[in-house]
């Protein structure tokens, strides 16, 4: 916005046109005119919108309503919504519910909100994710949402809040590595731990999983590790990324010497090495001082007894329902927060 305003003031342009930014927030011009820039939902530049062009649809990672404008929204109704989990899905659900005129209580077990967004926001190469996190923190602060951090959520606590509807957004946990009959590796670490702590690792590093998290952790370690090898069983690393962004991301990693093995699968571990089945079907031994797991997530539901013990409607959203990406998390959060209380399930 500052750059656009400067161009207009200098007379360098008569009009500044925006594309993806207006998909992320169609109200951007109005909010800018009202000097309310912090309320503008930022575009991530993730090109999710471009991915849907081929099927003649428009979607947006951060704007779940894009392409769904004609969907009927229930009339505002009173009621108390309790949201468990302050990650992207939970934050979106809480804001959507508050916007429908409901009393909202948000419970988060950590000392700060954001969940997986905090991991992405820590990248210098991803400044838009920090802006998105700031946007959510600003919006929940403005909304009349009761936020409880460092919350130990249990059945008694939820019952005491007397919710009319419960939205569970407790996220997922890293998928473990299961290799029957394999020798345990001496140094195994989850990729999410490295992204959270920015731990520096040296020596020969093998990353199992070439999804977005695998690419992120390889980027973090590329300046300290002697050599990084990514093992990906699919035909393309970073397959969730839009094609042009994926090409740039992979080119950057290769520039730092990261080796990416496609159509390859880890078949067993040794104390300081791994054995991989390569595309030709042969076995290949790779030195691995550190084994980093980026195998995705599995749902986490720390309160399985809630479903039976509480009579109020309950909705599971985000990774605790089905691990996916930010687009799915925010879409499920918006839908759950907007739904009629009697229809949450």
Name these PLM-found stretches.
Residues 11-12, 143, 162, 183-184, ...:
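Short, structured coil segments at secondary-structure junctions
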Residues 8, 75-109, 113, 148-159, ...:
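Rossmann-like dinucleotide/flavin-binding elements
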Residues 1-84, 88, 92, 96-99, ...:
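Flavin-dependent oxidoreductase catalytic cores
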């Amino acid at each position: 916005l500052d750059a656009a305003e400067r161009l207009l003031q200098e007379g360098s342009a008569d009009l500044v046109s925006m594309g993806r930014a207006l998909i992320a927030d169609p109200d951007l011009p109005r909010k800018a005119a009202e000097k309310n820039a912090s309320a503008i939902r930022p575009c991530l530049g993730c090109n999710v919108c471009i991915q849907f062009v081929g099927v003649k649809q428009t979607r947006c990672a951060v704007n779940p309503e894009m392409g769904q404008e004609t969907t009927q929204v229930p009339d505002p109704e009173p009621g108390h919504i309790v949201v468990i989990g302050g990650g992207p899905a939970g934050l979106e659900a809480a804001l959507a519910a508050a916007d429908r005129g409901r009393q909202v209580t948000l419970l988060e077990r950590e000392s700060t909100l954001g969940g997986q967004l905090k991991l992405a926001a820590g990248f210098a190469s991803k400044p838009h994710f920090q802006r998105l996190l700031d946007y959510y923190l600003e919006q929940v602060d403005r909304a009349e949402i009761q936020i409880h951090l460092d919350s130990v959520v249990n059945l008694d606590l939820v019952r005491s809040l007397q919710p009319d509807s419960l939205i569970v957004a407790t996220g997922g946990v890293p998928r473990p590595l299961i290799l029957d009959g394999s020798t345990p590796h001496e140094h195994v670490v989850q990729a999410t731990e490295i992204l959270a702590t920015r731990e520096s690792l040296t020596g020969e590093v093998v990353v199992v999983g070439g999804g977005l998290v695998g690419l992120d952790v390889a980027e973090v370690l590329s300046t300290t590790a002697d050599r990084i090898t990514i093992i990906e069983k699919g035909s393309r690393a970073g397959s969730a990324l839009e094609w042009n962004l994926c090409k740039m991301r992979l080119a950057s990693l290769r520039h730092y010497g990261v080796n990416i093995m496609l159509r390859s699968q880890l078949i067993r571990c040794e104390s300081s090495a791994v054995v991989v089945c390569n595309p030709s079907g042969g076995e290949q031994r790779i030195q691995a001082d550190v084994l980093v797991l980026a195998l995705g997530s599995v749902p986490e539901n720390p309160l399985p007894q809630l479903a039976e013990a509480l009579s109020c409607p309950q909705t599971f959203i985000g990774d605790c329902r089905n691990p996916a990406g930010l687009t799915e998390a925010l879409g499920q959060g918006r839908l759950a927060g907007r739904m009629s209380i009697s229809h949450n399930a």
